[in-house]
């Protein structure tokens, strides 16, 4: 391992982290600096082939445009989600949303777990592509939670199901290298990563409550939190090990929400007054359905389009992904916003005014997202080899602790790419080679990579910026990342221990 090369490859990440967390600057200011620095490295230090300036421009130009195009798609999703929140505020339906949820449970901690953890798990399976945080964070804000902690909770809620993604794509496509090599199957890959995340969802309810309410938040809520964690854990284990990757995330989220609400109704939660949600004592303007209609439409249309369109249209999934996977999710969210506006009785003029105001709020996000995604594309590019250098150097140093390192490598890949799928595809072959040279099980090692990649979404700057934009918290990314980094460290340590136990002690011959 060449330490200088390692630090130089790591430096774009350090610029982002030090700028946001160390100097407490907004991502909007830090990301262009990181982009300029990464471009300088690509033209000089990591110009390993000695290409001329003109040739380098030709190589990097497609990467720059790719980053801008992907940034536009994410901003479109942010626009759709933020428009819905602004519609609810404009019409006053937001107060009726609060009172509707309060009628199910007036305990803010129950609301936090159901909307912050279980709903994102469902949405990840229904759509993925950033939809969970983009929908759950505004929903929590609508219920009266602080925007910063709402974002952190929504991102944490999506830290486990991203290993399956929309219809299991992250595991199915991400683990294709193992399947093609005859080392594993989709079922084995899905089952083993489920054995990581079942412990993640077991502790996440406690992390969420501690993050939002502190130690006092556990008063009277421990039995419910135990039930929420254990029930989600059991459902996730069963679906991932005995049903399949395609339904694990959506099924876990839906069943867990139903079980949680049944517990609240049948057993109840002891709610101190300070954690009781007090609905405004005023006459309802809208029925529960009308007030929550944009979110109800999303819960129905996202899975309906994802599973229904490919079922009835030849090559339907390919058609959906003509402009990239995330684009169909953008369109569905925009349509749900329009349907919600019609259901709420919003005039065309009023709807246009809300959209115009929202455009002004989210447009600056394009600079941030575009810059960070261009950095990501350049670091992933074989031309610079920066990401592969980081991963291979980590692998070379750790030796027999490679299973734990695989979790860290997976997280690093997702931190850069913004997706677990991108991280899995990037590093799967490297893990196969490392497992062969070390005489270890490639299935458990890849499961650690897959689990780490899902967890890495929690701290990815791209995801943080996008989520901040949905609740008008642009510029507060450093506050969000302080919360998410602490949660990330706890779950990362757990997964690294599990990776060592599974590979070296419990399942050394799993699937072999």
Task: Show which residues each predicted segment covers.
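Structural signature of hydrophobic alpha-helical transmembrane segments
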Residues: 1-11, 71-74, 129-132, 187-203, ...
């Amino acid at each position: 391992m060449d330490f200088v090369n390692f630090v130089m490859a790591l430096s774009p990440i350090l610029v982002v982290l030090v700028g946001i967390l160390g100097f407490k600057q907004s991502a909007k200011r830090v990301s262009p600096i990181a982009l300029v620095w990464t471009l300088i490295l690509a033209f000089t230090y990591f110009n390993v082939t000695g290409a001329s300036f003109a040739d380098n421009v030709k190589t990097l130009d497609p990467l720059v445009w790719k980053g801008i195009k992907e940034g536009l798609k994410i901003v479109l999703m942010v626009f759709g989600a933020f428009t819905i929140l602004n519609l609810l505020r404009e019409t006053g339906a937001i107060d009726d949303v609060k009172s509707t949820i309060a009628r199910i449970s007036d305990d803010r901690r129950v609301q936090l777990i159901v909307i912050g953890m279980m709903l994102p798990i469902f949405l990840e399976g229904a759509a993925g592509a950033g939809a969970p945080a983009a929908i759950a964070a505004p929903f929590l804000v609508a219920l009266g939670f602080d925007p910063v902690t709402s974002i952190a909770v929504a991102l944490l809620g999506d830290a486990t199901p991203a290993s399956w993604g929309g219809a299991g794509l992250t595991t199915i496509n991400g683990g294709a290298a193992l399947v093609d090599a005859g080392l594993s199957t989709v079922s084995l890959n899905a089952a083993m990563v489920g054995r990581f995340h079942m412990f993640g969802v077991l502790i996440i309810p406690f992390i969420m409550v501690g993050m939002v309410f502190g130690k006092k938040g556990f008063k009277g809520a421990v039995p419910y939190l135990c039930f929420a964690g254990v029930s989600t854990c059991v459902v996730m284990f069963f679906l991932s090990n005995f049903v399949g990757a395609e339904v694990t995330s959506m099924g876990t989220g839906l069943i867990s929400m139903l079980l949680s609400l049944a517990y609240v109704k049948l057993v109840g939660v002891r709610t101190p007054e300070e954690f009781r949600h007090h609905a405004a004592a005023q006459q309802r303007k809208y029925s529960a359905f009308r007030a929550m209609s944009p979110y109800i439409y999303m819960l129905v249309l996202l899975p309906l389009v994802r599973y229904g369109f490919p079922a009835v249209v030849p090559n339907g999934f390919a058609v959906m992904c003509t402009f990239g996977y995330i684009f169909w999710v953008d369109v569905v969210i925009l349509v749900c916003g329009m349907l919600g506006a019609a259901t709420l009785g919003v005039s065309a003029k009023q709807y246009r005014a809300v959209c115009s105001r929202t455009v002004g709020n989210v447009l600056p996000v394009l600079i941030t997202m575009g810059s960070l995604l261009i950095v990501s594309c350049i670091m992933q590019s074989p031309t610079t080899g920066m990401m592969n250098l980081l991963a291979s150097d980590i692998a070379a140093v750790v030796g027999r602790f490679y299973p734990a390192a695989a979790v860290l490598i997976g997280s690093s890949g997702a931190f850069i790419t913004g997706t677990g799928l991108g991280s899995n595809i990037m590093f799967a072959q490297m893990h196969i080679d490392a497992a062969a040279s070390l005489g270890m099980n490639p299935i458990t090692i890849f499961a650690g990579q897959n689990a780490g990649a899902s967890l890495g979404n929690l701290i990815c700057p791209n995801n943080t910026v996008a989520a901040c934009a949905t609740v008008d918290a642009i510029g507060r990314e450093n506050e969000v990342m302080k919360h998410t980094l602490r949660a990330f460290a706890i779950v990362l340590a757990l997964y690294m221990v599990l990776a060592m136990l599974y590979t070296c002690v419990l399942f050394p011959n799993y699937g072999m």
